[in-house]
């Protein structure tokens, strides 16, 4: 008689794929990290989870007829999946809605055309918004859904679980908008065509803490109240203002004992940051079937920023003209370098004195663009161009909506060389949570 070896937890996880998937799916990522440190035989659990349970195509299959084709369009247009959609991906939870940012102009037009070809129906008209060139809402109801007849976002309807989509055509680059738009730190997550980035994974997924960001408090007390009431507690986390200990650590005062200040370590302000650095949880997504884009990846992979505490914000005025206190918050700080003589927009941390790119400001490239445009023949100049600079030079040539002249010279090599000289000397990017 053959005796089967006894089955224990290690054996279930290592030898039986269905049991492995079932067990790991029930564990939060911080528990998986703890499990991987129990013994050598379980040290592979984290890597196994990343390989088997973070398949972006599975999450997108509910929204698009072909996830691969959507990701090809995403790569072509530099679109970014953001907000709660990206957070749900890191949580390994299914999502019923998807939020996408894409730069206005040809990229937004290409994405809109694809969505309509894929069967999405635009709800109502494009919504005007001060931060976007346009907000587009789409739905894709199933055949049995009673809401299929809904044609305007103001119509009465019952909530359903059919896919819905929000596309923001951004005035700035999609990346800069994705970093500025969130109201709370737990929402600082983005998904590109090839990678998923969580900028504050330790705070969000290990400590389970969420803090206010500038965008939640810089308008009015009423706006802050709306943010706090409408915020979905995806992680069952209360939203906190700035951690007082972090503020003391960042700005020591005479009231802060030196011994206490030395003991306090900020959980959010990690100093000069780069997308995909050791403080970022980076997941490389499968790219089988994806057409490698011809565009440079440096604007995203070399984007630098800093998340800084604002412990004493000034009071803000309510609708009745009364000053009200403002809770402390964090803000994402970066400078945008964009001009018609640059193919891409670059994000640079202005506080990083060791970054040679800080010595190159957007003004230089605006002036270069101005002189190049002035040297063009009248038929080659952008529409409505006048020498007094009435046409904006804050964006790339694509925002002009006309063909690039044959003689036009690009200066991206200069910026990219500066970025490489700053970051390539650092240690390799870790790209993992543990």
Model-flagged regions — what are they?
Residues 35-43, 47, 57-112:
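Active-site nucleotide-donor binding segment shared across nucleotidyl transfer reactions
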Residues 2-47:
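N-terminal Skp1-binding subsegment of the F-box domain
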């Amino acid at each position: 008689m053959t005796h089967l070896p006894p089955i224990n937890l290690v054996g279930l996880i290592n030898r039986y794929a269905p049991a492995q998937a079932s067990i790991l799916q029930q564990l939060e990522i911080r528990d998986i990290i703890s499990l991987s440190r129990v013994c050598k035989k379980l040290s592979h659990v984290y890597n196994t989870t990343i390989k088997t349970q973070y398949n972006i195509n599975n999450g997108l299959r509910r929204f698009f007829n072909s996830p691969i084709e959507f990701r090809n369009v995403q790569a072509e247009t530099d679109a970014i999946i953001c907000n709660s959609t990206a957070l749900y991906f890191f949580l390994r939870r299914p999502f019923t809605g998807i939020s996408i940012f894409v730069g206005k102009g040809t990229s937004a037009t290409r994405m809109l055309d694809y969505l309509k070809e894929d069967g999405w129906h635009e709800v109502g008209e494009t919504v005007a918004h001060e931060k976007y060139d346009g907000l587009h809402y789409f739905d894709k109801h199933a055949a049995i859904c009673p809401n299929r007849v809904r044609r305007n976002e103001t119509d009465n309807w019952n909530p359903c679980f059919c896919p819905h989509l929000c596309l923001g055509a951004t005035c700035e680059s999609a990346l800069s908008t994705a970093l500025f738009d969130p109201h709370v730190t737990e929402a600082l997550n983005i998904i590109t065509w090839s990678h998923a980035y969580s900028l504050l994974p330790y705070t969000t997924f290990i400590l389970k803490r969420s803090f206010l960001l500038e965008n939640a408090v810089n308008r009015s007390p009423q706006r802050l109240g709306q943010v706090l009431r409408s915020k979905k507690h995806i992680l069952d986390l209360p939203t906190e203002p700035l951690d007082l200990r972090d503020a003391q650590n960042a700005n020591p005062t005479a009231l802060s004992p030196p011994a206490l200040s030395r003991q306090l370590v900020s959980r959010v302000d990690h100093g000069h940051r780069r997308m995909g650095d050791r403080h970022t949880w980076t997941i490389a997504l499968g790219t089988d079937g994806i057409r490698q884009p011809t565009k440079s990846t440096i604007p995203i992979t070399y984007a630098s920023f800093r998340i800084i505490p604002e412990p004493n914000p000034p009071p803000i005025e309510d609708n009745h003209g009364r000053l009200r206190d403002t809770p402390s918050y964090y803000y994402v700080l970066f400078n945008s370098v964009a001009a018609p003589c640059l193919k891409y927009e670059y994000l640079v941390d202005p506080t990083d004195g060791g970054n040679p790119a800080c010595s190159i400001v957007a003004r230089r490239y605006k002036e270069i663009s101005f002189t190049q445009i002035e040297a063009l023949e009248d038929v080659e100049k952008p529409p409505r161009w006048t020498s007094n600079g009435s046409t904006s030079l804050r964006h790339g040539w694509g925002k002009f909506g006309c063909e690039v002249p044959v003689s036009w010279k690009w200066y991206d090599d200069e910026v990219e060389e500066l970025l490489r000289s700053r970051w390539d000397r650092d240690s390799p990017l870790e790209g993992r949570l543990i």
